[in-house]
Amino acid sequence: MSYAEKPDEITKDEWMEKLNNLHVQRADMNRLIMNYLVTEGFKEAAEKFRMESGIEPSVDLETLDERIKIREMILKGQIQEAIALINSLHPELLDTNRYLYFHLQQQHLIELIRQRETEAALEFAQTQLAEQGEESRECLTEMERTLALLAFDSPEESPFGDLLHTMQRQKVWSEVNQAVLDYENRESTPKLAKLLKLLLWAQNELDQKKVKYPKMTDLSKGVIEEPK
């Protein structure tokens, strides 16, 4: 077939048959899973998976304990305690990553607003965040969005209510986790996440070339649709 010829389209059934015939070593899949559990700090799950699969983690699982404590604090909204623990483990981390420090401080402001501590929130914003807002337009915008929650009787239902969702805490934790791993010269992004990003990149390249192919439209469920 010449390069000028249009390749035959492949149906979803044909694509699924090719996938089913592709042999992937179980050990390789298990290593991907273990890598994800360790990188994300899921110690108990990693220990259980090691017993079930026989795959050894790349690091001593005991080294995950401090990251687990930080994660628990952030997901509970105990931001000041998390900052103190980060500083005790890596005194220079927040000094050298000012944007991360701002996000932690911003999250503490969100927690004060969640608890309806309006005066404390305003004072904290003025004394701890105002200077960073003056230095960074991006920080100023984020601080203004956060303080805008105070203008609503039901901030959870406001246009800025996403800041009060639990996913906001998870977002901050993910940023902290990556920063800590980078600081410790460890892998900060799970290999599985890198593979998914590669998949999205490949699909985007095909879309731009107007290629019709069975496309994965839901990564979390592995949903593949017919070519369109």
Curated annotation (Swiss-Prot):
Q: How does the annotation summarize its subunit structure?
A: Homodimer; may also form higher oligomers. Identified in the CTLH complex that contains GID4, RANBP9 and/or RANBP10, MKLN1, MAEA, RMND5A (or alternatively its paralog RMND5B), GID8, ARMC8, WDR26 and YPEL5. Within this complex, MAEA, RMND5A (or alternatively its paralog RMND5B), GID8, WDR26, and RANBP9 and/or RANBP10 form the catalytic core, while GID4, MKLN1, ARMC8 and YPEL5 have ancillary roles. Interacts with RANBP9. Part of a complex consisting of RANBP9, MKLN1 and GID8. Interacts with CTNNB1, AXIN1 and GSK3B.
Listed GO CC annotations: cell junction; cytoplasm; cytosol; nucleoplasm; nucleus; ubiquitin ligase complex
Q: What is the similarity comment for this entry? A: Belongs to the GID8 family.
Span list, region Interaction with CTNNB1: 116-212
Tissue specificity, per the record, is: Up-regulated in colorectal cancer tissues (at protein level).
Is Cytoplasm a UniProt keyword of this protein?
yes
Q: Which InterPro entries match?
A: CRA_dom, CTLH/CRA, CTLH_C, LisH, Ubq-SigPath_Reg
Where's it found, cell-wise?
Cytoplasm; Nucleus
In this chain the CTLH domain maps to: 63-120
Q: Name one GO molecular function term.
A: protein homodimerization activity
Q: What PANTHER family would the database entry show? A: RAN BINDING PROTEIN 9-RELATED
Taxonomic superkingdom? Eukaryota
Domain LisH as annotated: residue spans: 25-57
- Organism for this UniProt entry: Homo sapiens (Human)
Name this protein carries in UniProt? Glucose-induced degradation protein 8 homolog
Q: Please name the GO terms of the biological process aspect recorded for this protein, alphabetically.
A: positive regulation of canonical Wnt signaling pathway; positive regulation of cell population proliferation; proteasome-mediated ubiquitin-dependent protein catabolic process; Wnt signaling pathway
How is the protein altered post-translationally, as described in the entry?
Polyubiquitinated through 'Lys-48'-polyubiquitin chains, leading to proteasomal degradation in the absence of Wnt stimulation.
This protein's encoding gene: GID8
Protein purpose: Core component of the CTLH E3 ubiquitin-protein ligase complex that selectively accepts ubiquitin from UBE2H and mediates ubiquitination and subsequent proteasomal degradation of the transcription factor HBP1. Acts as a positive regulator of Wnt signaling pathway by promoting beta-catenin (CTNNB1) nuclear accumulation.
Q: Which UniProt key words apply to this protein?
A: Cytoplasm, Nucleus, Ubl conjugation, Wnt signaling pathway
